[in-house]
């Protein structure tokens, strides 16, 4: 899918390294810079791919995901906002509406090291169908040798949220994640609280855990691709570790049957409590990603 994105015809050359393209129904922004290749969908301000020069793709994007208006994209970095997980009210979209609506590219800046982009979503008749509040939501990205994401929300309300990042791995059976802390809510086991005794999360089967006292950096050890991905978290309360495992993967129409084998989600989240946003104090949720050889 990522190769397909970079082979799409250019609709508009925004700058020497930025172009607008289209995949099925969705407008994309493609970054082709000497230090980095990356792509975004305007729907959801969704980072689809990020590949620093000399590295393998860092993010995973499903080859089966549709690029349709209003349909969530499977992979990359979905922005879950203003709620994380199932909606409290029946009939509303899981993980909020921010990932399903078109955003605006507000600004971009390029230098020798990479590209910075800011996307914006504000209240509209469409958002009021889901949520009554006025808001301005900004998604700031800096892509180069590292990837930095900052979700900034303005208004008067409370939210839960996550940067639901899908990381590309060689073989989930040879992946471990450290730095998650010990206490977690096990969403596969009736949301019971449990403890990770050795500090190392592996993914033998379906895993869906909300960690309650994570460190500020999670480390993904990928034995098959012989690399380490360091995931920094800022302004967060939780880190979520997720992989659907074989049975759920087969049931998901936007994922290959064996899709679970080549990704792991390590998510920067504010999920176990609400985050308060006021006019005097906007809220942030931020993630930084670095890659290194093992």
Positions of predicted regions on the chain:
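Beta-strand-rich recognition/accessory modules
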Residues: 1-34, 43, 127, 136, ...
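Short acidic/polar mixed-charge low-complexity motifs
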Residues: 34-37, 46, 55-58, 133-135, ...
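Acidic-aromatic substrate-binding/catalytic surfaces of carbohydrate-active enzymes
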Residues: 34-93
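Short, well-ordered beta-strand segments enriched in hydrophobic/aromatic residues
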Residues: 38-40, 141, 147-155
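Short, hydrophobic/aromatic beta-strand segments
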Residues: 49-51, 156-164
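Beta-strand/loop-rich accessory regions of lumenal/periplasmic or secreted enzymes
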Residues: 70-99, 178-191, 215-218
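Extended, loop-rich substrate-binding clefts of extracytoplasmic carbohydrate-active enzymes
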Residues: 92-144
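Active-site/ligand-binding surface loops and adjacent short beta/alpha elements
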Residues: 158, 166-240
């Amino acid at each position: 899918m990522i190769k397909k994105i970079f082979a799409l015809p250019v609709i508009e050359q925004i700058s020497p390294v930025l172009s607008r393209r289209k995949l099925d129904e969705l407008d994309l922004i493609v970054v082709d810079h000497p230090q980095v290749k990356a792509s975004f969908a305007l729907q959801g301000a969704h980072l689809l791919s990020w590949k620093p020069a000399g590295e393998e793709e860092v993010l995973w994007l499903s080859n089966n995901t549709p690029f349709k208006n209003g349909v969530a994209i499977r992979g990359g970095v979905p922005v879950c906002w203003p709620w994380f997980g199932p909606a409290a009210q029946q009939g509303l979209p899981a993980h909020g509406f921010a990932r399903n609506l078109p955003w605006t590219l507000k600004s971009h800046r390029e230098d020798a090291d990479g590209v910075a982009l800011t996307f914006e979503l504000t209240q509209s008749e469409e958002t009021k169908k889901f949520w009554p509040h006025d808001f301005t939501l900004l998604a700031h990205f800096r892509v180069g040798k590292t990837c930095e994401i900052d979700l900034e929300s303005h208004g008067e309300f409370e939210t839960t949220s996550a940067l639901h990042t899908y990381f590309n791995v060689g073989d989930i059976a040879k992946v471990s994640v450290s730095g998650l802390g010990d206490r977690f809510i096990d969403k596969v086991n009736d949301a019971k609280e449990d403890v990770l005794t050795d500090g190392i999360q592996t993914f033998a089967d379906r895993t869906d855990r909300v960690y309650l006292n994570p460190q500020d950096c999670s480390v993904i050890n990928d034995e098959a691709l012989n690399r380490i991905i360091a995931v920094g978290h800022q302004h967060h309360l939780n880190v979520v570790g997720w992989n659907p495992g074989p049975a759920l993967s087969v049931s998901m129409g936007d994922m290959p049957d064996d899709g679970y084998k080549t990704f792991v989600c390590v998510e920067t989240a504010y999920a176990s409590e609400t985050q308060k946003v006021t006019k005097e104090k906007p809220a942030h949720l931020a993630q930084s990603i670095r890659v290194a050889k093992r």
